[in-house]
Amino acid sequence: MLLQSTSLSFAYPGQPSLSFPDFSLSGGEAVLLLGKSGSGKTTFLNLLAGLLSPSQGQVILDGTVLSALQGHRLDLFRGQHIGIVFQKPHLIAALSVKQNLELAQFLSKKKGASPISLLQDLGIAGKASAAVGTLSEGEAQRVSIARALVNSPKLILADEPTSSLDDLHAQRVVQLLKAQAAKIGAALVIVTHDQRVKSEVSQVLEVKSA
C-alpha cells in the first residue's frame, strides 16, 4: 500500500479527542472523506499531510512514518511527495502561472513534471504567461491543481476543492483530480462536505465529530 492511516486521533488543547477512520490506498486509488463542517475533516487532512502530529496512530506514506520526520526533513519530504490543493488557491498573484509552478519545483528541490505539459493536460496552457491575479476562479483552481501536481507527488490531498463551484464544474474538478492521480500513480484524498461529488469516488469514508 502506498498510503496507510491507522488508529489516528488528535486533540486540540481543552477539546475532546478526535478519532478518524482507518484506510489505505494504493497508487492511483482515491478516497472521499465526507463530513459536515466542524467534523474534523481539515484536521484529518492536516494529519495526513504531516502538518499536525497525531496524539495516537500513524500515517505511513510509501514506507515512511510521517511523525518520525521533523523540521527540515519533514518539510522537504512534504514538498517532494505530497501535493495539496487548498480550498482557496495558495498562489502568488504577481507571478505568472508558469512561474508559480517553477517556484514550487525550486522550493522542493525536485524536478517533477514539465509545467507546460501539465498545464496542457489541465487545459490552461494558454494562460502560462498570465499573472495569476488576472485569472478567473475556475482557472485559478486549475492552476492550484497544477501546482499540487508539478512535483509528481505520491499523495494528493484536496481540501474542499468544489465548495465554490456549480454542479458541472464540481464534477469536472473531481474527475480531473482522479485522472491526474491515476496518470502519475498517486494516492488521492478528497476532503469535502459536498454531497454532490459522492458518486464520483468509489471509496467514501464518513468523518464524524465525537
Predicted regions and their residues:
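ABC ATPase NBD coupling module
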Residues: L66-G83
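Conserved ABC transporter NBD signature motif
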Residues: G57-V65
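Conserved ABC ATPase "signature" region
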Residues: V65, G112-K127
